[in-house]
From Swiss-Prot:
It comes from the Bacteria. One of its GO terms (biological process) is ubiquitin-dependent protein catabolic process via the N-end rule pathway. Functions in the N-end rule pathway of protein degradation where it conjugates Leu from its aminoacyl-tRNA to the N-termini of proteins containing an N-terminal aspartate or glutamate. GO terms for molecular function: arginyl-tRNA--protein transferase activity; leucyl-tRNA--protein transferase activity. GO terms for cellular component: cytoplasm. This is Aspartate/glutamate leucyltransferase. It catalyses: N-terminal L-glutamyl-[protein] + L-leucyl-tRNA(Leu) = N-terminal L-leucyl-L-glutamyl-[protein] + tRNA(Leu) + H(+); N-terminal L-aspartyl-[protein] + L-leucyl-tRNA(Leu) = N-terminal L-leucyl-L-aspartyl-[protein] + tRNA(Leu) + H(+). It is found in: Cytoplasm. The gene is bpt. Belongs to the R-transferase family. Bpt subfamily. Keywords: Acyltransferase, Cytoplasm, Transferase. SUPFAM superfamilies: Acyl-CoA N-acyltransferases (Nat) (SSF55729). It comes from Chromobacterium violaceum (strain ATCC 12472 / DSM 30191 / JCM 1249 / CCUG 213 / NBRC 12614 / NCIMB 9131 / NCTC 9757 / MK). InterPro entries: Acyl_CoA_acyltransferase, Asp_Glu_LeuTrfase, N-end_Aminoacyl_Trfase, N-end_Aminoacyl_Trfase_C, N-end_Aminoacyl_Trfase_N. Its main location: cytoplasm.
């Protein structure tokens, strides 16, 4: 760690939020630990925080800090060790006709329309289905680190947008939204495979997938990518099979 990075880390403070209803496990209360101030968290510091289990939502860098629950497990894919299974290989082949490009963080009405459609279809009543353009921008387009949008199209039609952070040692998959009526392309799976390939091309070691939660269907799918590493007891280790 450089003297500059050491100084920045020393300048970071942490506070715990008040309890709030958990978004993933019904009936439970959650808390978060938030790193502040946001302006002190540059790419190097953020990369260190991600390795400690933190994530980003807009300008907020946080990790779970619940009183009586440790269900949220940070996970990452080691790029050089990852081997797609048969289903994932089929998804990759099916997506061969899609074009993808990196874009800067900027408002695009077509992206926002897809985001709204995705939220209202997949997560109706989940708190984000009525996000207006400002709320969308605060969540997707505000960042103090090296962030880009990955845009995916098929025959010119917008199919998916993914918000990705570049870290010192990998890519962090922050948020992805896609055509909710396309049930054939397995767009979410394709996105993970694409990010693995991008990380490999960039010479990066990991793709950070956020939190794995065994009892939450929309988060448990991550264990389908192997070998998957999890942060447990302050150490990254391979998640057992099964």
């Amino acid at each position: 760690m450089s003297h500059r990075e050491a100084g920045q880390v020393a300048a970071i403070h942490f506070y715990a939020t008040a309890p709030y209803p958990c978004s993933y496990l019904s009936g439970r209360q959650a808390r978060s630990q938030v790193a502040i101030p946001a302006e002190a968290i540059d790419g190097g510091v953020y990369s260190q925080l991600v390795r400690l289990g933190f994530r980003r939502s807009g300008l907020y860098t946080y990790r779970p800090y619940c009183d009586s629950c440790q269900a949220c497990i940070p996970v990452r894919l080691p790029v050089d060790q990852f081997r797609p299974n048969r289903t994932q290989r089929k998804v990759w082949r099916r997506g061969a006709g899609m074009s993808a490009r990196w874009l800067p963080l900027a408002f695009d009405a077509e992206h926002y329309a897809l985001y709204r459609w995705y939220q209202q279809t997949r997560h109706a009543g989940g708190g984000m289905s009525d996000d207006d353009a400002q709320q969308y921008s605060e969540f997707i387009l505000k960042s103090g680190v090296d962030s880009h949008l990955a845009e995916f199209r098929l025959d010119g039609e917008l199919k998916m947008v993914s918000l990705v952070d570049r870290l010192v040692d990998g890519l962090s998959a922050v948020y992805t939204f896609y055509d909710p009526e396309d049930s054939q392309s397995s767009l979410g799976v394709y996105n993970v495979l694409w990010q693995v390939e991008q990380a490999r091309m960039l010479g990066l070691s990991y793709v950070y997938l956020g939190y794995w939660i065994a009892d939450c269907r929309k988060m448990a799918y991550k264990s389908g990518y192997r070998p998957l590493q999890m942060l447990h007891g302050g150490r990254w280790q391979t998640m057992p099979e099964g």
